[in-house]
Amino acid sequence: NTEKLPGGLAGLSERIHAMGMKFGIWVEPEMVSENSELYRAHPDYAVTVPGTEPARGRNQLLLDLTREEVQEYLIREMTGVFTRSRADYVKWDMNRNFSDYYSQALPAEEQGVFAHRYVLGLYRVIRELTERFPKILFEGCASGGNRFDLGMLCYMPQIWASDCTDTLQRARIQNGYSYGYPQSVLGAHVSASPNHQTLRRIPLESRFAIACAGVLGYECNLSDLSAGELAEIREEVKLYKEWREILQFGQFYRLKGHAAKGRFDT
């Protein structure tokens, strides 16, 4: 939509790259709006049960990824988006629950395997895209960590752990992840204070201490930060870059008695 974004993604990407930065894009391609060219042309591409009113999430329906033609559509469209935008980073998100477990392309006796076929279709799409764009850093996400599993990690080297970025909550979340996954796949960010989910106020140093035990990022409005906070972030990033190989790939030990009562987290 060049009315909203003059020059389109290509123009925006060009400006970002000219600043010496890399360009990332956040996509959520598994849904379809009923007020769209795709739905008007192919209403059968949506996951609905014939004769019933479909469940909608944010006025959207799911695309039926059990169908090969839908998979091909997503591969083609995302290839165009990534090519035009010259993306360096892609966050692949999925923010609604499954509903209306039914495919108009499956016979009645196979409707029970709909969810399994859907995930196999998703794997085909992201396998094709990650092979076409080996230089793009892909990060998986599904309302946080709802797809944090070994299947997605076959195609994407890191996954967003949770939409809850509160430092105390994240300490427990990331500790739990550490029993099954290495730190190098764990997306962890320093976010605003007070925290958006819990309204808890936590010092920047403490937020960094937890977020650096994974793949570090910052999701703050830089214009809201003081000169002192920006200087502190610069030092944190410098420290992380110096030690990130150990933080991501070193041997990880947990302190005994972690969060026994939730009052003295380590």
What are these regions (language model features)?
Residues 23-27, 90-92, 139-140, 218:
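Hydrophobic faces of well-ordered beta-strands that scaffold small-molecule active sites
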